[in-house]
């Protein structure tokens, strides 16, 4: 069974909030869509989340759902914009 305490939930929610803000900024500012440093920052955030708050499996699931899939969508959108 998954043990959820207040600190773990708050850290995960804070991480998700930071991620959503970064993703919104990347989508609004067009040059950041192709930025490698944004991807590196997100990887650093997921490693910090893994070390501080969650198990490796939960961290991997969060990575796939909230980072890998949205970044794939951003990459596809940027590729589409560069072909126009």
From Swiss-Prot:
<keyword id="KW-0244">Early protein</keyword>
<dbReference type="InterPro" id="IPR004270">
    <property type="entry name" value="Papilloma_E5_alpha"/>
</dbReference>
<dbReference type="Pfam" id="PF03025">
    <property type="entry name" value="Papilloma_E5"/>
</dbReference>
<comment type="similarity">
    <text>Belongs to the papillomaviridae E5 protein family.</text>
</comment>
<protein>
    <recommendedName>
        <fullName>Probable protein E5</fullName>
    </recommendedName>
</protein>
């Amino acid at each position: 069974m998954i043990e959820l305490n207040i600190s773990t939930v708050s850290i995960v929610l804070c991480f998700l909030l930071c991620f959503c803000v970064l993703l919104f900024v990347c989508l609004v500012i067009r040059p950041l869509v192709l930025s490698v440093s944004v991807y590196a920052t997100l990887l650093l955030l997921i490693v910090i989340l893994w070390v501080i708050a969650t198990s490796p499996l939960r961290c991997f699931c969060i990575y796939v759902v909230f980072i890998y899939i949205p970044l794939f969508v951003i990459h596809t959108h940027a590729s589409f914009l560069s072909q126009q």
